[in-house]
Amino acid sequence: MRALLPLAEMGEIASFFAVDREARAGERLNIAMLRSSAAVARVTDLVRKYAGPEARPVRAIAFDKSPGSNWFLSWHQDRTIEVKSRLEVAGYGPWTRKQGRLHVSPPFSVIERMTTVRLHVDPVDQHNAPLLIAPGSHRSGLVSTPE
């Protein structure tokens, strides 16, 4: 989408993601701090228009993918979710920690109900596009690593 939000609202969102550029690959943010933002509310409303009225944000991650701090990332599927506590439930695992936060790989039936929304707060064009997507790959279920 182009011009999803006015420039001022994108600036508001960008201010939430002002992280130490040397800190780490992705800074996981406290979703509670985003709830009061009118710009985030507008994005949530747009997502609900397409994903349904029950859609809600569950995680926000800021990535600094600028030329000075970029890193290589091969094709992959995001397969983990952040959880508050560890409960042994059939189909969930393995467990990991990312920046001290607990994550688990859930059954694919959980993953396939999730939608990722990516906002670029810096100018993006065909020469610096930070993300490549394999269209339709979500219909293939869990894809093995070599694929």
Where are these regions (language model features)?
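Non-heme Fe(II) oxygenase catalytic core, chiefly the N-lobe of the double-stranded beta-helix
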Residues: 5-147
